[in-house]
Regions:
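Conserved hydrophobic/aromatic packing and binding residues within compact polymer-binding modules
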Residues: 5, 19-20, 30-33, 59
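The alpha-helix within a helix-turn-helix
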Residues: 9, 20, 49
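Recognition helix of helix-turn-helix/homeodomain-like DNA-binding domains
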Residues: 25-39
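DNA major-groove recognition helix of helix-turn-helix
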Residues: 9, 34, 52, 60-63
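A short, Lys/Arg-rich alpha-helix, primarily the initiator
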Residues: 1-17
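DNA major-groove recognition helix of helix-turn-helix/homeodomain DNA-binding modules
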Residues: 43-58
Length: 63
């Protein structure tokens, strides 16, 4: 999932800090996803999907 997120973030040339500020998802949470400490909850995926204007299923597709 993080790889998909990172692709969207990088494509838009924004930082994790900007995503965190805009969505309310903390940079610590984003870091935990990156490091594989835990998977995102569905409500956070919905927030990211809306933020990046993609269907939530985008994050579930094979990487």
């Amino acid at each position: 999932m993080y790889k998909k997120y990172a692709e969207l973030r990088d494509k838009r040339n924004i930082t994790d800090y900007r995503v965190a500020a805009d969505t309310g998802i903390s940079t610590a949470t984003l870091s935990n996803w990156k490091n594989g400490n835990y998977a995102p909850k569905f409500d956070k995926l919905l927030i990211l999907a809306k933020y990046f204007d993609v269907p939530v299923e985008y994050f579930a597709e094979a990487e």
